[in-house]
Amino acid sequence: KIGASITNKKSIEAANKIFQNFVNIDELQKIASKRISKCFKTESAVITASAAGGLTESVASMMTGNNLDNVYQLPNTKNMKDRVLIQKGHLTNYGAEVSQGILLSGAKILSCGLKKYCTNEIFENTLSKNKNKISCAMYVVSHHCSDYNAISISDFIKICKKHKIPSIIDAASEEYMEDFFRIGADVAIFSAHKFMGSLTAGILAGKKKYIKNIYLQNLGIGRGMKVGKEAIYAAIIGVENWYKRDWKKEIENQNKILKYWLNYLSKERFNGITYEVIADPTGNKINRLRIHVDQKKSNFTIQSLSYHLEKNKPAIFVRDDLIHLNHFELDTCNLKKGQETIVMTEFKKIIAKLKSKEIKHNINQKEYSNKSKKEWLNWLN
């Protein structure tokens, strides 16, 4: 919705520089592979148009191998191993369904366990029984996924290695890229435009033999997901800049914002509003402010607060993934200096309007979800 992170200056400079030149894309991708894999401490890397596109291309590559006839044949998977093994709790939605990203390649999904339950035994038994059909297994690292009674990423990789099944890790929103290769991931997928603040692109890294086959997809279904020279070069600079950053200073800045918000809310004492600082669910070095709304005390719903913050001018977008549980989060990431005060000023204005019923105060979860769908359907109307 908000165009990813704010692009860092060095990535912008890199894009502007290469815009003015012709390049050999194959050679540029080789440079990207060499420089990015060095940062990630793995064998190889390739840049794709997006992490979502990279997911589809990585699955495709596991079916085709280095057989160009197979590459040309997709999404027809005749005579290929075309099953992707994944925990049911990892078939989530990140704006689109993970399942759809897999199916776009022509592959079929082989899910195991329940939405909130999968053991090592269930995963391994499913793998063993279907080994002659499975091309790869996928693990999604995301706050969207259920990690309750799910198998761990380390166990997932160990089981895959035991049965010689390639592993794909979807870690689009993670900041510790090298950790996945340290524990043995064959391929991992990252976003260049999230934490690293580069141009929109996917970064796929891992074992050289798999990365080479991913690159071959540009001759097939990957053609519709091709990446430009500017995103490739900006991703190189974005990754290298990420590993040079002063992360201690970043954490200090985040904590200052959180402290300001906590002090502001403590002074205002909004009726029915409670709050707490929470850590990032997947272990990134980020803390966020979680806002709870008690409708009986506040006389408005949390869905109403979120909706009107977004429709406000200036718009305030919150992390509303778990709003059905009666809370949302305020994120410190990427805020420019002084914007933390704007967030609280507008927060106060919207609450006042909700309390006076100047704006709709009783939006429920169903209405909230439907409003978003209607806006998509009414685009350009």
Residue ranges and their predicted role:
Residues 1, 34, 43, 127, ...:
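N-terminal charge/polar-biased segments
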Residues 1-26, 32:
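Glycine-rich phosphate-binding segment of PLP-dependent enzymes
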Residues 1-6, 30-48, 52-247, 257, ...:
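Conserved PLP-enzyme active-site core in the AAT-like
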Residues 15-16, 33, 59, 262, ...:
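A generic alpha-helix structural signal
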Residues 16-18, 43-49, 83-87, 292, ...:
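Short glycine-rich or small-residue beta-strand-to-loop segments that form or flank ligand, phosphate
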Residues 22, 144-146, 336-337:
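Short strand->helix junction
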Residues 266-363:
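Conserved C-terminal alpha-helix-loop-beta "cap" of PLP-dependent enzymes
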